[in-house]
A protein has these predicted regions:
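Glycine-rich, proline-tolerant flexible connector loops at the mouths of alpha/beta enzymes
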Residues: 1-17, 65, 131-141
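Generic structural signal for well-ordered alpha-helices
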Residues: 18-22, 50, 71-78, 115-120, ...
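Conserved anion-binding
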Residues: 54-138
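Hydrophobic faces of well-ordered beta-strands that scaffold small-molecule active sites
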Residues: 1-2, 36-42, 61-63, 87-91, ...
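Alpha-helix-loop-beta-strand connector modules within alpha/beta enzyme cores
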Residues: 10-39, 76-92, 143-168
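C-terminal helical cap(s) of enzyme catalytic domains, especially alpha/beta-barrels
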Residues: 73-81, 176-179, 183-188, 192-209
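Active-site beta-loop-alpha junctions enriched in small/polar residues
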Residues: 5, 43-45, 66, 92-96, ...
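Catalytic cores of alpha/beta
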Residues: 36-61, 147-182, 197, 202
Length: 209
């Protein structure tokens, strides 16, 4: 899971660096008995940023929920890739007391429709998979956004991936309990970087039933 944070926050782009990382991962994957799939995310909200992400030749691209601001482009793009598993929708949201769960764009003041409203539209537009992030949890090691995940899982039968906030193996156990309700996986980041647990330990927890 590779994120162009500069693009996501409107500070430029890390395309060249990501290209080098993708090449290294592809080389490692060629030597591995299990292929390594690459998912690219961060700031993909229009034709230009999607083209930049696709130039990296990833297995999947996450289109940010900020693309809801241009619903015509998003609808056309989802239709173009309707028969492919190439695109996922990165559903970024924040809880606002007056409105409930609302879609947002990181690095901006933009807020879009309520999550329930956005999901109803996205389901009709043909989204095949959601990467769900409570932005107040992302990078915080404060635990996963279970409340937001509950809202999303109730409303869709598409695969859902949790992102942000995981700090411990106990968090993974909690997320694993959501698998019967449609949770497909989890994105790990800071917890691995700071050494809270190893990737091997995470796989052991996630793989047990």
């Amino acid at each position: 899971h590779l994120v162009d944070l500069d693009l996501a926050f409107g500070r430029g782009t890390n395309t060249e660096v990501l290209s080098e990382v993708v090449a290294a991962v592809r080389a490692e994957s060629a030597r591995s008995s299990a292929p390594i799939r690459i998912q690219v995310s961060g700031g993909v909200r229009n034709a230009e940023s999607l083209e930049r992400a696709l130039s990296l030749n990833p297995d999947r691209v996450n289109v940010t929920s900020a693309a809801l601001a241009d619903s015509s482009w998003l609808e056309d793009t989802l239709a173009r890739y309707a028969d492919s598993d190439l695109l996922a929708l990165g559903l970024d949201a924040r809880y606002i007391s007056e409105r409930g769960w609302v879609t947002v764009a990181r690095g901006t003041d933009w807020s879009g429709p309520a999550v329930a409203e956005a999901l109803a539209w996205l389901e009709g537009a043909g989204v095949r998979r959601y990467i769900v992030t409570d932005v107040s949890k992302d990078g915080s090691l404060a635990g996963p956004g279970a409340e937001l995940l509950d809202v999303v899982l109730v409303q869709t039968d598409r695969p859902v991936v949790a992102s942000g906030g995981v700090s411990s193996l106990a968090d993974l156990v909690k997320l694993r309990s959501m698998v019967p309700y449609g949770l497909e996986g989890v994105v790990l980041g800071k917890a691995l970087y700071v050494g809270n647990f190893s990737f091997e330990q995470a796989l052991e927890v996630a793989g047990s039933r």
